[in-house]
């Protein structure tokens, strides 16, 4: 129990104080090109298309680029990559760099609740059987067993509160774990699912490696900082978005115009 509780607290602490993956304020879109064409209709269409492109990959409040799977969070007033939701339990955003710690926090909290329920349930069952034997068979329980099965009022109240908390938080963490498992399996965060969007198709193992930031190993079960893979993913998302905006140049305008039509 002590180990599980320690791991839950450690995971919660790492999740609370880890930067979730905020797009830096300096990561602004490239300067908008001055589009001039002989054909006014073509120029107007290009400006409209670039406006849509700019609104898709930049955020109007922060002025920064907005990579795919990223969303604006009012709590931190920034664009966060692979944002799932803001969790008041950890006072942080569950996103690219914090989802691993959030999942570990939920996992170890759930195990702690299950262990509490099993331990207290076992105590109740053991005492029930002992009292039944003593009542119907004349079998005398030991003094230690009798004291354990006849708690005082304080012990009774604490036990009842423990059982209630274990059931409530156990059910809550199981539900949260199922929701996160669905998000990982579909490679789609919570906000994107609300917007009817779907992430890239990939295997479950690939999705889990994206969340944990490294291939499967013993480090998955501990709130340790992942390898460089998470940082590479963060930089790749930002670079892809910047390139999408920077590639809009006169030399490729006809290709974009063809896409618009």
Report residues per predicted region:
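Membrane-associated feature with strongest affinity for ZDHHC
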Residues: 1-261
């Amino acid at each position: 129990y002590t180990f599980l509780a320690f791991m839950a607290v450690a995971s919660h602490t790492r999740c609370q104080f880890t930067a979730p993956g905020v797009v830096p304020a300096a990561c602004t879109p490239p300067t908008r090109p001055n589009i001039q064409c002989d054909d006014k209709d073509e120029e107007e269409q290009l400006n409209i298309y670039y406006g849509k492109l700019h609104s898709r990959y930049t955020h109007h409040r922060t002025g920064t680029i907005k990579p795919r799977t990223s969303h604006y969070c009012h709590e931190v007033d920034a664009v966060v990559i692979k944002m799932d939701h803001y969790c008041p339990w950890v006072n942080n955003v569950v996103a690219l760099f914090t989802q691993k710690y959030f999942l570990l926090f939920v996992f170890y909290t759930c195990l702690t609740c299950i262990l509490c329920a099993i331990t207290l349930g076992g105590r109740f069952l053991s005492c029930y059987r002992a009292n039944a034997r003593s009542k119907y068979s004349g079998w005398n329980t030991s003094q230690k067993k009798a004291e354990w099965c006849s708690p005082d009022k304080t012990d009774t109240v604490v036990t009842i509160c423990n059982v209630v908390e274990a059931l409530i938080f156990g059910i809550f963490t199981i539900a949260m774990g199922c929701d996160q498992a669905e998000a990982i399996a579909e490679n789609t965060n919570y906000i994107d699912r609300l917007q009817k969007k779907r992430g890239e198709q990939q295997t479950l193992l690939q999705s889990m490696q994206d969340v944990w930031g490294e291939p499967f190993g013993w480090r998955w079960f501990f709130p340790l900082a992942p390898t460089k893979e998470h940082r590479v993913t963060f930089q790749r998302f930002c670079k892809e978005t910047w390139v999408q905006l920077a590639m809009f140049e006169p030399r490729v305008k006809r290709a974009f115009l063809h896409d618009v039509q």
